[in-house]
């Protein structure tokens, strides 16, 4: 069956999640997205009664970008579809291609435009999918990369659906041919600086001459890879269920896995945390370093803003630059007093209760600061004074989080460490008024 409004409806029924609140077509002004919008408009709102609108992102890179913008406006007026035009400028980072920067900026705008539960529709077709797989293969991608583009994924406040991913480009072109408003040809499609354009103009014709069905074959291979990735994700989730130890992973458990399953489990763990996983080689080398280290070492591997850290027999994922308590600050020694400790550090609050710090013995204000080294404290129900360092080691406070611990002083005397320990010499007597230290919204420290 060739592409039509009816075939689009069938694809939308299958791929648009239940509960979607509307359809948003990403309209470039090219033939493919114009055909998709025309087919969606032909449904006349009959698909689940969902409203339809379009968004055009003008990044100004094409010499004819104004023509694209006007073509989009003309088409939407012709079809009776509401259009939003967003203008942006592109600034590629060092080492980043203009092609990648433009794509990322465009998707960032589209993501921001989505209202809750709206579905973004893009006109990626079978040829696009085949090209994506081939480009990923040339870059040495793994199974996930070779899955190319998913048909549906969570995106912003809603979803991103590619309803024509298995449709030949020729069918989209044929469907869009009768449109009253002609689409604009993108001159950037002839710019060989871009990898996809180079592949499309110089490499693809040679491959297609030898293998005429190459787009269908590669798109089918991408589907097989997507199914394989589902199995890898399921295996990773099953392994993580056995490996999880609080917020960390068990080092002995990781060691017991085969190399391939270990890599897969950690990659899945990183994905679930929203972290961009490095290459398999980098993950493998990082795991080798942290797993082979002696138990008394504190190996860590930093990737951008994140770090893998091992403490004793657990592996943690943390920020590369852990939060650190700022300079010393004052906290009124009164019930209800609260001190914000800074970003990602929560707040200290004093609560009236029997027990805790002896309210009558405290000065008007308490001093809160991070440890400087050498601090000691005699914990309640302990027979001797101990160093804060020793107490942290005994409790298993993560070494990289110890500078986040708020130490509470009455003058020069350390009276409490967060809500972990209170000095016995400053504890309220039975029945006497006391102030308990609460660390609210505290970061993970053990």
Task: Kindly give the residue locations of the regions a language model identified.
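Core alpha/beta nucleotide-donor-binding catalytic domains of modification enzymes
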Residues: 1-210
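Internal, active-site/partner-interface "lid" segment
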Residues: 189-196, 217-226
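AMP-forming adenylation/ATP pyrophosphatase catalytic core
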Residues: 3-32, 49-53, 59, 88-92, ...
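Short, structured loop/turn "capping" segments at alpha-beta junctions
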Residues: 182-184, 213-218, 232
């Amino acid at each position: 069956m060739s592409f039509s409004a009816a075939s689009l409806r069938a694809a939308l029924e299958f791929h648009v999640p239940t509960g979607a609140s509307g359809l948003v077509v990403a309209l470039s002004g090219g033939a493919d997205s114009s055909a998709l919008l025309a087919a969606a408009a032909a449904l006349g709102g009959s698909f689940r009664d969902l409203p339809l609108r379009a968004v055009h992102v003008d990044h100004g890179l094409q010499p004819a970008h104004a023509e694209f913008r006007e073509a989009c406006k003309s088409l939407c007026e012709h079809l009776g579809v509401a259009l939003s035009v967003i203008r942006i400028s592109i600034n590629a980072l060092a080492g980043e291609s203009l092609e990648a920067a433009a794509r990322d900026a465009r998707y960032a705008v589209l993501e921001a435009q989505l209202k809750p539960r709206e579905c973004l529709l893009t006109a990626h077709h079978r040829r696009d999918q085949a090209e994506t797989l081939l480009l990923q293969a040339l870059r040495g991608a793994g199974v996930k990369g070779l899955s190319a583009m998913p048909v549906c994924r969570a995106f912003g406040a809603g979803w991103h659906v590619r309803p024509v991913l298995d449709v030949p480009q020729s069918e989209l072109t044929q469907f869009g041919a009768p449109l009253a408003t002609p689409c604009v040809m993108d001159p950037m499609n002839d710019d060989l600086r871009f990898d996809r354009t180079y592949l499309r103009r110089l490499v693809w014709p040679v491959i297609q001459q030898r293998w005429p069905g190459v787009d269908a074959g590669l798109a089918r291979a991408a589907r097989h890879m997507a199914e394989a990735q589902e199995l890898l994700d399921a295996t990773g989730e099953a392994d993580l269920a056995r490996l999880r130890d609080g917020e960390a992973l068990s080092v002995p458990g990781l060691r017991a896995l085969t190399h391939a399953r270990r890599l897969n489990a950690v990659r899945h763990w990183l994905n679930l945390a929203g972290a961009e996983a490095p290459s398999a080689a980098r993950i493998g080398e990082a795991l080798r370093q942290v797993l082979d280290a002696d138990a008394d070492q504190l190996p860590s591997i930093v990737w951008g803003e994140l770090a893998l850290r091992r403490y004793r027999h657990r592996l943690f994922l943390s920020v590369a630059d852990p939060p650190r308590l700022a300079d010393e600050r004052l906290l009124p020694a009164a019930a209800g007093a609260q001190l914000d400790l800074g970003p990602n550090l929560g707040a200290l609050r004093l609560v009236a209760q029997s027990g805790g710090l002896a309210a009558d013995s405290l000065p008007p204000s308490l001093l809160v600061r991070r440890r400087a080294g050498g601090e000691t404290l005699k914990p309640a129900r302990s027979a001797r004074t101990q160093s804060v360092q020793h107490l942290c080691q005994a409790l298993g406070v993560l070494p990289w989080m110890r500078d986040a611990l708020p130490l509470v002083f009455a003058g020069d005397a350390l009276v409490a460490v967060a809500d972990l320990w209170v000095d016995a010499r400053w504890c309220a007597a039975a029945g006497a008024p006391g102030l308990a230290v609460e660390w609210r919204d505290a970061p993970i420290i053990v």
